[in-house]
Amino acid sequence: MLTKEQKQEIIKKYQLHESDTGSPEVQIALLTERINRLNEHLQIHKKDFHSRRGLLKMVGQRRKLLNYLKEYDINRYRELIEKLGLRK
């Protein structure tokens, strides 16, 4: 679970302008952080299938947002996956 401060830090790092909180970049960065934390949880709790299902939903949502960004602006897409260290 992300704290309010951690969430604000991620938003500040990826926002496009001062009041930006919902751009695809910000949403993808927040999802990536949640996915990484859930991955760590699942390394320890291997039989937590409910959380695994949530993880798969989040990965699917992130993939949809990445596909949207790729169609909308390929340069922003490439820059974001470079920053986040994602494949593809």
Curated annotation (Swiss-Prot):
GO terms for cellular component: cytosolic small ribosomal subunit. HAMAP family: Ribosomal_uS15_B (MF_01343_B). The keyword Nuclease does not apply. One of its GO terms (biological process) is translation. Signal peptide: none annotated. GO terms for molecular function: rRNA binding; structural constituent of ribosome. It comes from the Bacteria. The gene is rpsO. Belongs to the universal ribosomal protein uS15 family. This is Small ribosomal subunit protein uS15. The lineage of its organism: Bacteria, Bacillati, Bacillota, Bacillota incertae sedis, Caldicellulosiruptorales. NCBIfam families: S15_bact. Keywords: Ribonucleoprotein, Ribosomal protein, RNA-binding, rRNA-binding. Part of the 30S ribosomal subunit. Forms a bridge to the 50S subunit in the 70S ribosome, contacting the 23S rRNA. One of the primary rRNA binding proteins, it binds directly to 16S rRNA where it helps nucleate assembly of the platform of the 30S subunit by binding and bridging several RNA helices of the 16S rRNA. Pfam families: Ribosomal_S15 (PF00312).
